């Protein structure tokens, strides 16, 4: 599957001028609020007609402003999952799911329906009405309805944005199964680095209506300058490595990076598989000498490569630890007391890290 998108569109004072391609799997449109992600996915869906541009899927032209061609949304055979579930309140879950079948043609596919229902873990909800579902359950039903329409492409616009952290944690594993088992190409809009790092095969970074970076997720997310696109609270390092071993008793995975071996909390992990490690900058302390007697499991030796200041009295210190780029967010006073400057040797004390196998 090859999706090619090029669009220019003005909305008030905001101008979208962006292009990208997707070769299947999960392509994440990532960026801060107002970067143009939702406008782009609405253009792909056919819900917004661009002023200029062209969209094609596997060689089929869906929109071409030069030829005045625009295929309506209902003829594109795309599934769409919104921020809110948008279920019909007067219908049961089973009836909401069957609604998706109205948009597909072909033979009866009860076996496929059952597979999707099982994959999303909603078989026990079929007779309930939406008002008796949790937020996470509603979104799983909405995803099921979109899948039952047999879409050529699944569009997901911030599907977890309206959920609290507990509900997000509940639904993420189902999205992983969706990615791995259905093989339906997905365009996934999000401003959450945790979601993107866990789900995406390819990342398109958007800012002010333009594409700033594009490529394989492992490559884009590991770039030293990627943190500039993150909210301050999410700033940090995303490193690629391989799982060497898993300590089931202590729930720790040993992840080999370029030079370091990190111990990272994990419920399960398989030795020999690739993984990404998320290290929040706010959870990295710095020391000039290697400390002893700490509870922190990971202490990396490196040197300062860059310092970025912000208006809130905080600075971001970038370090090279054996080829792995680590970031730490500390106060400007701490920077002064440690006399930190590019080239200075330091030890990075990692208080927490998250593992995302892929």
Curated annotation (Swiss-Prot):
Subcellular location, record wording: Cell inner membrane
Superkingdom of origin organism: Bacteria
GO molecular function terms attached to this record: ABC-type molybdate transporter activity; ATP binding; ATP hydrolysis activity
Gene Ontology CC: one annotated term: plasma membrane
Keyword GTP-binding appears in the UniProt entry: no
Sorted UniProt keywords: ATP-binding, Cell inner membrane, Cell membrane, Membrane, Molybdenum, Nucleotide-binding, Translocase, Transport
Domain Mop as annotated: residue spans: 293-358
Root EC class: translocase
Binding of ATP, residues: 31-38
InterPro entries for this protein: AAA+_ATPase, ABC_transporter-like_ATP-bd, ABC_transporter-like_CS, Mo/tungstate-bd_C_term_dom, ModC_ABC_ATP-bd, Molybdenum_import_ModC, Mop_domain, P-loop_NTPase
EC nos: 7.3.2.5
Substrates-to-products reaction catalysed: molybdate(out) + ATP + H2O = molybdate(in) + ADP + phosphate + H(+)
Keyword rRNA processing listed: no
Residues annotated as domain ABC transporter: 1-233
Membrane topology of this protein: Peripheral membrane protein
Record's function text: Part of the ABC transporter complex ModABC involved in molybdenum import. Responsible for energy coupling to the transport system.
Subunit structure: The complex is composed of two ATP-binding proteins (ModC), two transmembrane proteins (ModB) and a solute-binding protein (ModA).
UniProt similarity note: Belongs to the ABC transporter superfamily. Molybdate importer (TC 3.A.1.8) family.
Official protein name in the record: Molybdenum import ATP-binding protein ModC
Gene (name only): modC
